[in-house]
Amino acid sequence: MNIKNLRLKAGLTQVELAKKMHVDQAAVSRWESGETKPLRKSHKRLAKVLGCTVEELLKEGE
C-alpha cells in the first residue's frame, strides 16, 4: 500500500487523515510504516478520503 504517498498528494497530515477515518494518528502511522494495514472494510472509505481508487490504494509503494 502506498498510503503515505497518497496522503501527501491529497495534502493531508496524518492527524487530518486519522480524523477523517475515525482512527487515531498512531494507526495512520502504523499503516504508513507497514506495521499494520487498514481493515479491508475501510479500503473504500480510505480511497475516497485520499481521492484515489481502491486499486491505486492497494498498489505497492512506488
Model features per residue range: what roles?
Residues 56-62:
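Short amphipathic recognition helices of helix-turn-helix/homeodomain-type DNA-binding modules
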